[in-house]
From Swiss-Prot:
Entry's Gene Ontology molecular function annotations: ion channel inhibitor activity; toxin activity
Similarity comment text for this entry: Belongs to the conotoxin M superfamily.
S-S pairs: 44-56, 45-54, 50-57
Domain notes: The cysteine framework is III (CC-C-C-CC).
Coiled coil location: none
Tissue expr: Expressed by the venom duct.
Alphabetic keyword roster: Cleavage on pair of basic residues, Disulfide bond, Secreted, Signal, Toxin
Keyword Signal: yes
Protein's name in the database: Conotoxin Pu3.6
GO CC terms, sorted: extracellular region
Source species taxonomy: Eukaryota, Metazoa, Spiralia, Lophotrochozoa, Mollusca
Residue stretch(es) of the prosequence: 13-41
Protein's UniProt keywords contain Signal: yes
Range of residues in the leader sequence: 1-12
């Protein structure tokens, strides 16, 4: 089967899908919180911003 080679090229005007592997449509920060929570790890937060997704650094 023959087809034009141009069909394999991407258009420069075509927007890049930034979070292609992000199935839940989360931004990178939300995705990181989700992954760290799933791994049982939490980020360090500065009080009074401490909550369930992080632990207090100070």
């Amino acid at each position: 089967v023959l087809f034009p080679l141009a069909t394999l090229q991407l258009d420069a005007d075509q927007p890049v899908e930034r979070y292609a592997e992000n199935k839940q449509d989360l931004n990178p920060d939300e995705r990181m919180k989700f992954i760290l929570h799933a791994l049982g790890q939490r980020r360090c937060c500065i009080s009074p911003a401490c909550n369930d997704s992080c632990y207090c650094c100070q």
